[in-house]
Amino acid sequence: MSTESEARIQRIATLPFEKAGAPEGGLVSGIAPAVRDIWGHRALLDLLIRRELKARYKDSALGFVWSFIRPLTMLAIYYFAVGQVLGAARSVPQFAIYVFAGLTLWGLYNEVIAGGTTSILANAGLIKKVYVPRELFPLASLGSALFNFAVQFVVLLAAVVVLGQFPLSWNLLYVPVAVVLTVIYGLALGLFLSAVNVYLRDVQYLVEVALLILFWASPIVYSFGMVVDRAAARGQEWIVTLYQLNPMTDIILAFQKGIWRAGSETTTMADGTVVPPQPFPVDLDFRLLVLAVVGLALLLVAQRVFARLQGNFAQEI
C-alpha cells in the first residue's frame, strides 16, 4: 500500500462518525437535534433550492416567465369555463380575483406536497454518496415552491391594486396566517410522504390523484357560499361540516377573506343583481387556531416518522 493511501486512511480514521437516520430522543426531544443539524447545513439548503429552481427552467427560452404563464393560463381557463360558461361568476363578485387567490395558495400547497413526495428519490445519487440531513430535500422543495408562490402573489397584488380592490382592513392579516398554515400542512405531508415513497413507489401517483380530488373539494373555482346554499336547500347541513374537514377549506377561505375585498361587501353585479357578503364561517378565527395546533402536531409526528425511516434510504433507492 502506498504512503499516500496509508495517509488517507489515517486521515479518514480520525474523522467523527455521522449518524444517518438514527432518531435521537423521543417524540419531542428528538426534534432539537434534527433542527440543529438542518441549521448547520443551511448553506447547502440554499444551494439545493437554487439548483432546483435553475433545473426547472434549464434550457428554457422564457425561464422564470413560466412561473407567470402557467397560473395565468389556469386563471383564464377557469374564469371562462367555470365562471362564464357554467355561470359561477354570476354569484361571485370580482370572480377573477377570487379564483386567482385560490389558485395561488393552492399552487403553493400542491407544489410543496408533490415536490416533497419525490424529493428523496430525485436526489438518490447525492444521498448514496455523502451524508446530509435528509430533511433538506423536502425543505428544498418547499423553498422552490415559496419562490413560485411569491412570484404569483405579486401578480395577484398587482391585479387587486389595478382593479381598486386592495383590502385596507384588518382582514389583510388573514393572508400571512393562511400562508403559514399552508406551509405547515404542506411540509408535514411532504416529509411523511417523501419517506414512505422510498419504500412504496406507488405513493407518488396516489398523491397526484389525491391532490386533484382535494382541489375540487376546496373553494377555489366555486364559492363556499354555493356549498352552504346547496346544502341548506337539501336540508343536509352536515355536508358543510364534512366539507370543512378538509383543512385547506378554511385556510383558503382565510386567504380569500384577506385579499378578496368584494367577498366581505354587498356588491351590485353588472346585471343589477345584489350579492350579499360571502358567508365565511363565523368561527373562522377559532378554526384557524385549531388548525395551527393540529398542523404543528402533524409536523412533529411527520418529522419523527421521517427520522425513523431514513436509515435505509441509501439501500432502498
Segments from the language model and where they lie:
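Hydrophobic transmembrane alpha-helices and immediately adjacent juxtamembrane helices
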Residues: 1-317
